[in-house]
Amino acid sequence: MKKTALLITALFGASLANAHNVWLEPVKDVKGQYVVKFGHEETETYPQSKLKAVRLLDAKGQLQNATVNFKEGEAHFAAPDADIAFIRFDNGVWSKLPSGKYVEKTKQQAPEAVLSVNPIKFGKAILHWDAQANKSHNMDYELVPQSEPKAGQPLDILVLVKGKPVQGIKVGLGEDHPFNLTNEKGIAQFTPKAGYNKVWAEFDEPVKDNPDYTKRSVEYMLTFDAK
């Protein structure tokens, strides 16, 4: 079920806006076609302006921007030759008022707010397993599987921020599920199931003297198929 952004704002506020993620799904019965999904427990439509980038990586490690067709509140694109797709999504600024209500306004627009947060979402979809799948690709945030996944067997996942391993990052099925923390080498284990898998991670990005928000939350979703 899909809900409009207006309904989400009225009913759920920023707590769920923060918990939402973006990920890629294949279009049913259309080979090489994909759609960018957004949501938490249910998928939701989103304004095109919030989708900041969809980039495709080929077998040679070359990146290019996808040609996106936005329809029915979701982004669609073709990627017949891509090995990996990277997504960046900015969910705006949400401010908590003294009443406890969240509104989609900046700190400047709601100066009485006690908290203003900018939720950023990243998605990485591994479409084909080859040498590129186990490499990093110079992204600000990235989850890198250290081997091809096998259903039911623990998989080491390297977590990088600006190319460097980071310790203490939550990695799991999602915010509402159990998670593992990355170790001193930036590695956390995840046990995939047969079929389609989502691997979630959460980061905190420091904010100083920003006129629009006091906090930036970063959530990441890695997706792949396992046999």
What residue ranges belong to the model's regions?
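Short beta-strand segments within Ig-like beta-sandwich modules, predominantly Fibronectin type-III
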Residues: 65-69, 178-183
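Short acidic/polar inter-strand loop motif in beta-rich domains
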Residues: 90-98, 206-210
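N-terminal signal peptide c-region/cleavage motif recognized by signal peptidases
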Residues: 14-16
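Start-of-domain marker
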Residues: 20-77
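Short, ordered, surface-exposed loop/turn motifs in non-cytosolic proteins
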Residues: 47-51, 163-173
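Beta-strand-rich domain onsets/edges
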Residues: 20-31, 97, 101-155, 177, ...
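Glycine-centered loop-to-beta-strand initiation motif
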Residues: 71-74, 182-195
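Short amphipathic beta-strand segments in non-cytosolic proteins
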Residues: 55-63, 169-179
